[in-house]
Design a protein with these regions (language model features):
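Short amphipathic helix-loop junctions that connect adjacent transmembrane helices
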Residues: 1-12, 235-255
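Cytoplasmic membrane-interface "Motif A"-like loop-to-helix N-cap segments
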Residues: 37-52, 275-291
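Helix-to-loop junctions at the C-terminal end of transmembrane segments
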Residues: 28-42, 265-279, 300, 305, ...
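C-terminal ends and interior cores of transmembrane alpha-helices
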Residues: 49-70, 289-322
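Juxtamembrane intracellular "pre-TM" segments in multi-pass secondary transporters
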Residues: 183-220, 316-320
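Multi-pass alpha-helical transporter architecture, strongest
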Residues: 62-63, 170-181, 300, 396-425
Length: 425
């Protein structure tokens, strides 16, 4: 969006608006969809439709060259809003398969391994894009192609835009093992209208029984706030890095590779922490780390380190990350990637520990609501703060507050100890 719009501050504002609209759509539909699918039984048919839609929307972003998009900016914003909504539905349906596939005892490790594996694939993809499309023609290394493969035109942003087609293709191919190998729930005898009415009744009953489900509802309230903060970091982190550090495609690919490697460690770390200290304490530690590091990120820039001016020389003559602020920013971003990935995995595991087993689908519907339907809040705060402050750093400042509020609410959640202790209790 920075290249398509031409202004990083405006780009951050427009992306915030798109995610806000997508979040509103999910808020109105996700819990009822989760409850209805719970009544129908199988999740995979719905998941297949969501994945197919995601693939098409992501691929459509190919038509956004920086020199006059084939799609108008309004259409691009609508596509991003659609991706936001579809990803939320995907998360809900995918998470509802976690416990049937891995069981209660294996949910934590499976969740962490899944995120670690996904980020490992991301590393391979980003390195491939770097070697095939970003570096050729920019550095004189003999082992590289002389120009981007397939004759892609840099003037039209094609080496950047090809990533949308690659991501869409990998998503389609990567979904095949899930549909082939992961077990699904048995189909009920209910028709779609009957499941809709029964699911609506389940949600109404859940609201009526709020006192009986107070503990998981407190957790979901906490997650609603801190996940908004984490989602804002994920959505705007790339825009923020490109804007405040003045990074182009080459640097952003290197940044993405580094963060993906760090995220692999985060996924593996989550599984270990969930088993040894329990997912609740794990989430607390991960959020505390996020709050500290995200605050430090606000003090970074091309000419400043941790809120202090910097004007030193280059550290080396390489193609990217040649200054101390860039190296420090890279390190802080890596810690954020570790903590965010671990927090996502641990919070997903925590819900499987505190939610009633027979209401898992409904609570995962509410889980998506707490993490995605209120995505309008994070983007709205970022959009408003960016407009008022006039800088990207001001725009990201509310994120720290969301993380802190979520951590405070999490203190009131019971349970979430290591599985052996919880079973014994």
């Amino acid at each position: 969006m920075t290249r398509v719009i031409g202004d990083p501050v405006l780009g951050q504002t427009l992306v915030a608006s798109a995610n806000k609209w997508g979040g509103w759509a999910v808020m109105l539909t996700a819990p009822l969809l989760g409850a209805m699918v719970d009544r129908l039984g199988p999740r995979k048919p719905w998941l297949a439709g969501v994945v197919a839609t995601l693939v098409m929307l992501i691929a459509a972003l190919w038509f956004t060259p920086p020199t006059g998009a084939a799609l108008p900016h309004g259409a691009v914003i609508a596509i991003i809003a659609g991706i936001t909504a579809m990803f939320a539905y995907h998360e809900m349906l995918h998470n509802a398969l976690l416990r049937p596939a891995a069981g209660m005892a294996g949910a934590g490790r499976a969740s962490g391994l899944a995120l670690a594996g996904g980020n490992a694939v991301s590393v391979v993809l980003l390195v491939t894009i770097l070697v095939a499309f970003a570096l050729p023609g920019k550095v004189g290394w003999n082992w590289l192609p002389a120009a981007p493969l397939f004759g892609l035109d840099r003037a039209l942003g094609e080496p950047d835009r090809i990533t949308t087609l690659i991501v869409a293709g990998i998503m389609a191919v990567g979904a095949i093992p899930l549909f082939h190998r992961v077990p699904d729930m048995a189909r009920s005898a209910l028709s779609l209208p009957q499941a809709f009415r029964a699911g609506a009744g389940d949600l109404a009953q859940l609201v009526r029984e709020a006192r009986g489900h107070r503990n998981p509802l407190i957790f979901l309230a906490a997650r609603m706030i801190f996940t908004d903060g984490m989602t804002a970091i994920l959505v705007f982190g790339g825009l923020y890095a490109a804007g405040v550090m003045h990074w182009g495609m080459l640097e952003m690919l290197g940044y993405g590779i580094t963060l993906s490697i760090a995220a692999v460690a985060g996924g593996l770390l989550a599984g270990v922490l969930d088993d040894r200290i329990g997912p609740k304490l794990a989430v607390k530690l991960e959020l505390a780390l996020l709050i500290i590091v995200q605050t430090l990120v606000l003090g970074m820039g091309r000419d400043r380190i941790l809120f202090q001016p910097w004007s030193g020389p280059k550290l080396w003559d390489g193609p990217m990350f040649t200054t101390l602020p860039e190296i420090v920013f890279l390190g802080l971003g890596s810690v954020l990637a570790i903590a965010i990935t671990a927090a996502y995995a641990s919070s997903r595991t925590l819900l499987t520990r505190v939610a009633p087993p027979d209401k898992m689908g409904v609570f995962f519907g509410l889980y998506v609501l707490s993490g995605s339907a209120t995505m309008w809040l994070g983007p709205l705060l970022v959009e408003s703060a960016t407009r008022l402050g006039g800088t990207q750093a001001w725009g990201m400042a509310p994120v720290v507050g969301m993380l802190l509020i979520g951590l405070v609410i999490l203190m009131f959640v019971r349970g979430g100890e290591p599985i052996a202790r919880q079973t014994a209790g």
